[in-house]
Amino acid sequence: ASASTESKWNISIRQLVTGANPMDILAVQEAGVLPSTAIMTPRQVQPVGVGIPIHEYEWNLGSSSRPNSVYIYYSRVDVGANRVNMAIVSRMRADEVYVLPPPTVASRPIIGIRIGNDAFFSIHALSRGGNDGGAIVSAVDMHFRNMPHINWMIMGDFNRTPGSLIGLLDPDLRSRINVVSPPSFTQTSGNTIDYAITGNSSTTSLYDPPRILAILAVAGLRTFLASD
């Protein structure tokens, strides 16, 4: 996902959200710079007390007479190179926006949105092994500990396989999550490191994973959006 970012948005991502079987929610790592046609809205979506900026943009993929807008929630975490900025694209406007602080000193922040009782997060674990992957899942779980009505999904580049990620989690958390992997590998070396984790933070009821088809960005356009 390191091609020219403007073309990445205008070709790959546009195709994923407007083509056949368009995606409702798309998690974008290495989001680079947003397309010039994405307009920042005046809505204040910044969570109180978290100093990591996030903004809402409206991106019209149709025309002025026949608009077809999606919303982009964009956090410029990479102020220097602009390469590893984070984004979530949604066909529906978010009811709430989340920015969870980096779970370890070296980690990136965790950004997310809530639509109804469903929360979606875009994450990018540390390179060379994704050692903070377990901390990322635990941080999301802890955030919703007193909100058992919320189902959450963490999507992105975990930089480690699902099996090795599960090994980082405590047994209680393992019983409340489900891994949703794309049908083919997502890294040129043949590993699957881009996938989703669904879960619920209720510790009193049995977790029943949602029936999710290929919601992952990497499943639809692996050649464009797979990891290096």
Identify the meaning behind each predicted range.
Residues 66-79:
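Conserved catalytic-core segment of clan PA serine endopeptidases
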